[in-house]
Regions:
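Acidic (Asp/Glu-rich) sequence patches and key acidic residues
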Residues: 1-137
Length: 137
């Protein structure tokens, strides 16, 4: 994951192992309109978007999937956030980030972004790197 990205997982009934059967197939089709299929380094991983930008990663096994999301704080678009929220809402998914399960809303995603080290880096790279150098993180 890049320094300008923040990530989180989607959970269903408080677990990251999501039964594939509960996911609406058309929700993935809708994702494609915003996030085309990107390059993957594993046959069991489907990447919607690009790994070094905003993307949704879907790990598949025989019955379950694990879904994570990376937000490119340096270039995030409202259309992308809305697509992520719609995907979660359509499938009854919650966001798991920083040891908390939260509803997938614009305000909650904004808070995830603003509270992230990625945001601090994008806002002021030199100050952020000085914090790292001075062990202030």
């Amino acid at each position: 994951m890049a320094i300008w990205q923040v990530d989180f997982y989607f959970v269903f009934n408080n677990t990251s192992d999501i039964p594939y059967a509960v996911l609406a197939e058309d929700s993935f089709i809708k994702l494609l309109s915003v996030f085309p299929i990107g390059k993957s380094w594993n046959n069991d991983l489907i990447v919607y978007g690009e790994l070094d930008s905003t993307c949704i990663c879907v790990w598949k096994d025989s019955n379950n999937v694990e879904i994570s999301c990376r937000l490119d704080v340096s270039s995030i678009k409202l259309q992308e956030i809305n697509a992520i929220i719609n995907f979660a809402d359509t499938n009854g998914l919650m966001i798991f980030c920083n040891e908390q399960t939260i509803f997938p809303t614009l305000d909650n995603i904004r808070k995830i972004i603003v509270d992230s080290s990625a945001y601090r880096f994008v806002k002021n790279p030199e100050s952020f790197l000085n914090e790292i150098n001075n062990n202030q993180l």
